[in-house]
């Protein structure tokens, strides 16, 4: 089964909690704090495996949760960090964040790795909080929660050349005679419903990968039929080979077919029309094909190459394959996302991340004040509320961030309810 798009949930491991402990040893009356730090949680890491061909494994397992770090221990022993959760994906997999639409990773090379969900760091033990003013602190941190994401995996086949055209124009037949691929061939539309790849030998020592893509119909760019699924696989190709039935045996006009497919490519966007095209006039062994070809050439631009062939009789194939190989040598790869494009492997790409406020305050209809924000929520989840010293530290952190003053400006008074995540507190002025 060929599966090229799935949605999954990933959750990185939480950091281990820090420990509150003291050194208790004979003849050491003032041993001091000895609570260890928690261990780092496990990242969720995707790794490319060239042996995989589809995303079918993700149909049966859609939830991936990494292990948590161990908690800190007494005698200043730190918790062990968890081993990363490694998930294997096929070449050509794009990982997108469903909530933001951001492309997290574009995985194309065997062994390439990408951290999809980052683990939380371990909480600090009380030994970390010792100061001259407080040499024996009774506070520690909880581990930081690991990142969780709903992501979409899209598989876009890796091919140098993509065959496009209406159904039953001979794309599968062409691939079968120029490579060892054996796609399904039959005398009905949409015989090909999944991409087929074949390694093509041009005959002069050069070779390339050709993809036979399922037939397109008008409206494919808007998702008519299986348009989006089919067009997705064209994005990685460097050269588009447009196969046209020049015999008109299906009752269609070759030039209208050519314009209709190009319109779908343009509507789908992603710079597809910037890719060089080679037109293949197929079924030249059929009646009326020569006349239709002459008429077709009068309507298109002179600089667009047209190669008359017959995939059945194998005529004209050598000239076509050499022309494709020549075009590939002068055509660079097209990045799926310009932001991800790099000039070379040594280029360091920095991503700008807008600075978020430490916290935000909103108010619900019942008068409850709601605190939100990544920083304040992280401080809250890492606070050990079983320790009075930790609670006092959290209150000082809120005051230093300006939360108390901001609540007063919003009209908060003694006894008002303040909510943070799923917890509620009373405001005390």
Swiss-Prot record:
Keyword Cytoplasm annotated: yes
Keyword Calcium: no
Cross-referenced InterPro entries: G_OBG, GTP-bd, GTP-bd_Obg/CgtA, GTP-bd_prot_GTP1/OBG_C_sf, GTP1-OBG_CS, GTP1_OBG_dom, GTP1_OBG_dom_sf, OBG_GTPase
Domain Obg: start-end pairs: 1-158
Domain OBG-type G: 159-329
Family: Belongs to the TRAFAC class OBG-HflX-like GTPase superfamily. OBG GTPase family.
Protein name per the record: GTPase Obg
Annotated gene: obg
């Amino acid at each position: 089964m060929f599966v090229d798009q799935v949605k999954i949930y990933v959750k990185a491991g939480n950091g281990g909690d820090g420990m509150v402990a003291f050194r208790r040893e004979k003849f050491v009356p003032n041993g001091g704090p000895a609570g260890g730090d928690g261990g780092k949680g496990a990242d969720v890491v995707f790794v490319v495996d060239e042996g995989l061909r589809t995303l079918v494994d993700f149909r049966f397992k859609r939830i991936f949760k990494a292990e948590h770090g161990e908690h800190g221990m007494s005698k200043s022993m730190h918790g062990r960090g968890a081993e990363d959760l490694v998930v294997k994906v096929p070449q050509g997999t794009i990982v997108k964040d469903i909530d933001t639409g951001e492309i997290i990773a574009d995985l194309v090379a065997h062994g390439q790795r990408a951290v999809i969900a980052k683990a939380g760091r371990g909480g600090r033990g009380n030994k970390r909080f010792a100061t001259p003013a407080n040499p024996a602190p009774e506070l520690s941190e909880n581990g930081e929660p690991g990142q969780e994401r709903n992501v979409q995996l899209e598989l876009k086949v890796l091919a140098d050349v993509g065959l496009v055209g209406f159904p039953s124009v001979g794309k599968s037949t062409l691939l079968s005679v120029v490579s060892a691929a054996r796609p399904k061939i039959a005398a009905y539309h949409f015989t090909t419903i999944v991409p087929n790849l074949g390694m093509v030998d041009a005959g002069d020592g050069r070779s390339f990968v050709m993809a036979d893509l399922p037939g397109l119909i008008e409206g494919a760019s808007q998702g008519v039929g299986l348009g989006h699924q089919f067009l997705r696989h064209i994005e990685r190709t460097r050269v588009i080979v447009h196969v046209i039935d020049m015999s008109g045996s299906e009752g269609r006009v070759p030039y209208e077919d050519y314009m209709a497919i190009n319109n779908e490519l343009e509507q789908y966007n992603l710079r597809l029309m910037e890719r060089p095209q080679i037109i293949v006039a197929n079924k030249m062994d059929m009646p009326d094909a020569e006349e239709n070809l002459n008429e077709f050439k009068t309507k298109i631009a002179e600089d667009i190459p047209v190669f008359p062939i017959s995939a059945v009789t194998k005529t004209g194939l050598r000239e076509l394959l050499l022309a494709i190989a020549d075009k590939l040598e002068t055509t660079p790869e097209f990045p799926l996302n310009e932001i991800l494009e790099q000039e070379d492997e040594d280029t360091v790409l920095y991503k700008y991340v807008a600075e978020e406020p430490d916290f935000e305050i909103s108010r619900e209809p019942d008068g409850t004040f709601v605190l939100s924000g990544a920083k304040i929520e992280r401080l809250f989840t890492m606070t050990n509320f079983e320790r009075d010293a930790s609670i006092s530290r959290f209150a000082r952190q809120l005051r230093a961030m300006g939360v108390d003053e901001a609540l007063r400006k919003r009209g908060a008074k003694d006894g008002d309810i303040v909510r943070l995540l799923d917890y509620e507190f009373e405001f005390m002025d």
